[in-house]
Amino acid sequence: MASILGDLPSFDPHNFSQHRPSDPSNPSKMVPTTYRPTHNRTLPPPDQVITTEVKNILIRSFYQRAEEKLRPKRPATDHLAAEHVNKHFRAASSSSSTQGL
């Protein structure tokens, strides 16, 4: 069993070389290294404010789907209703199924 799990990337300590401990006294909290530009071509605008969402993304999607279900459907227009008048539906022929008996 160990040979099957031996090639997994989690056993390779070099996979985690990009992380450094945020606090040397507590090495369990790892934070990734961040990019610090050496030029100002990619600096964000000075008035930019980054905020986090108050609602969790999963809860937000539940609320959005619930609102979509509650939203009233639009009524069919007269133009669409006129097209469907010309359609004829087949009657369920019970006589064809009884003829074989």
Swiss-Prot record:
Disulphide bonds in the chain: none
GO biological process, any: positive regulation of proteasomal ubiquitin-dependent protein catabolic process
Q: Extract the ranges annotated as region (Disordered).
A: 1-48
**Principal location listed in the UniProt entry:** nucleus
The record's listing under InterPro entries reads:
DDA1-like, DDA1_dom
Task: Tell me if Nucleus is a UniProt keyword of this record.
Answer: yes
Asked whether the keyword Metal-binding is assigned, the reply is no
GO CC term (a single one): nucleoplasm
**Pfam families reported for this sequence:** DDA1
Keywords for this entry? Answer: Nucleus, Ubl conjugation pathway
Q: Where in the cell is it found?
A: Nucleus, Nucleoplasm
Point to the regions of Polar residues compositional bias.
15-28
Similarity comment: family membership: Belongs to the DDA1 family.
Task performed by this protein: Involved in ubiquitination and subsequent proteasomal degradation of target proteins. Associates with the CDD complex and mediates the recognition of specific substrates for CUL4-RING E3 ubiquitin ligase (CRL4) by interacting with ubiquitination targets. Binds to the abscisic acid (ABA) receptor PYL8 (required for ABA-mediated responses) and promotes its proteasomal degradation. Acts as a negative regulator of ABA-mediated developmental responses, including inhibition of seed germination, seedling establishment, and root growth.
Assembly and interaction partners: Associates with the CDD complex, formed by COP10, DET1 and DDB1. Interacts directly with DDB1A and DDB1B. Interacts with PYL4, PYL8, and PYL9. Interacts with SGF11.
- Name the record gives this protein: DET1- and DDB1-associated protein 1
